[in-house]
């Protein structure tokens, strides 16, 4: 019983490390592709437009990341409607 619990915890730890490194690799590839195809100046411009605002169900870390009338869901980190109208 103890061995299976330790084994399960070890597997989960390894999976989380693998996922984190895969995420970093994807971000690096995205940055390299932007630089190659758009040039450095255009890549910087593209990053600014990416940071403008996130639409409904877009990923976010704070309420400011989301567009108007949306807020960042505290548990799932995506933009949801805040219940207000224009």
From Swiss-Prot:
Residues 1-20 form the signal peptide. The modification Phenylalanine amide is found at residue 85. Keywords: Amidation, Disulfide bond, Ion channel impairing toxin, Knottin, Secreted, Signal, Toxin. It holds the Pfam family Toxin_12. The presence of a 'disulfide through disulfide knot' structurally defines this protein as a knottin. Probable ion channel inhibitor. This is U22-theraphotoxin-Cg1a. It comes from Chilobrachys guangxiensis (Chinese earth tiger tarantula).
């Amino acid at each position: 019983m103890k061995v299976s619990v330790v084994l399960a915890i070890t597997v989960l730890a390894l999976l989380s490390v693998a996922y984190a490194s895969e995420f970093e690799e994807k971000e690096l590839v995205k940055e390299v592709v932007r630089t190659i195809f758009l040039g450095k100046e255009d890549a910087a411009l593209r990053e600014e437009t990416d940071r403008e605002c996130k639409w409904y169900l877009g990923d976010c870390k704070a309420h400011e990341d989301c567009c108007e009338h949306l807020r960042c869901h505290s548990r799932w980190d995506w933009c949801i409607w805040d219940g207000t109208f224009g």
